[in-house]
Amino acid sequence: MNLSDRERRDLVSQWAFDTRPILGRMHLWLENVEVEWLRGKQTPEFTKNISFMDGRMERLMTMTAAVTALGTQLFGRFGEGKDKTKDELNRVKKDADAISAYAMSESLWYATRQLPENHAVLVCMGEGLMPKVGETKEMGSNPQLGFGRVYARPQVAKWLDGRVTRLLNQKNYGWAEFREDIKNEGITVWGSAIDTLENTSRFAKGKPTGPLTVMHLFNQPLHITKPYEAYMGNLFLPIKVVRKAEEKSVLLDFMTPRKKVIEAIEETYPGIKRKNIHVWTLGGKSREKRLGWLWKQWNDLGVHLVEDGWVLPSGGKAFIDSGTYAPTYLVGTWIDGNKQTQLFLLDGYAASAEAMQAASLTPALDLDGTLVTFTSKFELPIEKERFVMRLKPGQPDFKQKLEELFQKTVDQDTVKKYTRMIMEAREAEMPLHHRVIRAHDFFPEKNWDVAAFSGYMCDDPYTGARGVECIDDQIYRVTTRISTPRAGKRVTFTLRLMEKPKEQRLIFNPLLIRFIYGEDFRTRPVKISDSGRIRNELQTLCSEALEYQSNGKILIRFDRIPPEVISLKDQKILREVLEWYKKHHPIWFHWLDMPS
């Protein structure tokens, strides 16, 4: 849409006004805004919102995605892990995760101060508990925004924090009690699933495509009661294919033999050539044990398994080493230059947060998405892994059924490990009792809604979105996307840094990291907001070391912080910082507890 100079100035002015809490916090100046409608009926900006949120909250959340992408790209050590040792690469990845998580957390903190007084955002699923590719369990979880993080006005946040603590600590306080308390208090809770940096390895290695930030907001909390992360099998198809199969009483989902899927595709798109059916799955030799059975099914059917470097409709090149979320936007058909129908679909597995995010896109993209919960280890091939979470550890034949899947005798340690993984999913109240999971199974109420926000650090070949572009040393263009069942828009911001690079870097770095790197915390003026800021940073940087006490305090156990996450030297500085704040500002930091 072409805008006159006056219309453009008005557009920028309103966006700047609505998003000023985030722009001010991050010391950014909004130079320009470009809005491109991708789906839905185009209406003049500011006349109609496209989600369950009001227009201002849509703009604040869109800016949150933009600021996270910009800050991570500029200050997250992009490309510094290239050709480095495994340990050095993982250090870069964790630093990148820390910047992205901090930028999004700070933006959400300021954005949600504009919520109605009885509203809150609750993070229900995050990405970072499991080791990333190339990491081991000993390296600890990654900086993240995970389950239980609350963003709201202070009184609402304090009240909701207390209920989340009860969910974590009290066995007799579950989802039913949590939901009843929310209703009785008259509070509206928006759930969220967040991955602050998708494709972290590609980011650390300096790959030109892939890295993005993803935040999904829902009009209700997800039915999940504990921090949980594992793998999930997933299959995404155009809804037309599933509807066509239903006409012949054929059920299409992740558990369906792929031969039946192909038959339904050919019924839906008469004359489509199998070589023009493109199936995207994660690839690589390391995944052959997990996915070999699935790859064989597709290869035997004569379809095209997407390979690394395959040219996409956008002109960009596919990658299959990571990144299961972005390809969801491409699922569907198009007509090529030879007037032949091409179909792209998504199969395989993903981490649970990414899988849930992709599944919740289905009403916005006219897709059908089905999931199956796997374990966090995924040691069995996919054809067996998909049955593990249905086993019942309390049954006498549990060990026997496990051995049938492994096709060998398993020791008691293996039995205990699988018992623990299954029980973790049950305790988090993951929906395990269905043949497959669809997005609506995560929600307590049927009328659920979603607003999906993406911010692109680098070019995205699946949607054609551009990554962060440098105009000059102070001005950058940042592309974002908002997708809802009503419409979809691409919003590109031109943002100017208001500080010199050294000062701007400090703004995007967690306060605790600045202290660890040498900033003098003793001479820095202390504000009451530092209490909440440091609390949030601890939850982001070392969540596994925190214990939430029934009296509202948080106990930090330094022995649970892996040195790969925070070195022993830096842990010593961190303890010194926290002890100083606790001693000199005991009222503001009454929530902080540390063993002697």
What is the predicted role of each segment?
Residues 7-11, 18-25, 42-45, 49, ...:
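General structural feature for long, well-ordered alpha-helical segments within catalytic domains
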Residues 250-251, 555-564:
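RNase H-like, two-metal
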Residues 2-106, 118-119, 208-262:
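Conserved phosphate-binding loops in N-terminal lobes of ATP-dependent enzymes
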Residues 342-548, 552, 564, 575, ...:
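Gly/Ser/Thr/Ala-enriched C-terminal appendages of enzymes
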Residues 51-119, 249-262, 274-280, 290-309, ...:
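Alpha/propeptide regions of enzymes that mature by internal proteolysis
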Residues 115-117, 185-186, 269-275, 335-340, ...:
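Flexible, charged surface loops at secondary-structure boundaries
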Residues 101-220, 311-320, 325-326:
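Flexible, acidic active-site loops/lids enriched in D/E/S/T/G that coordinate Mg2+ and/or position polar
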Residues 208-274, 280-425, 429:
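Conserved mixed alpha/beta catalytic, RNA-binding, or beta-rich assembly cores of soluble enzyme
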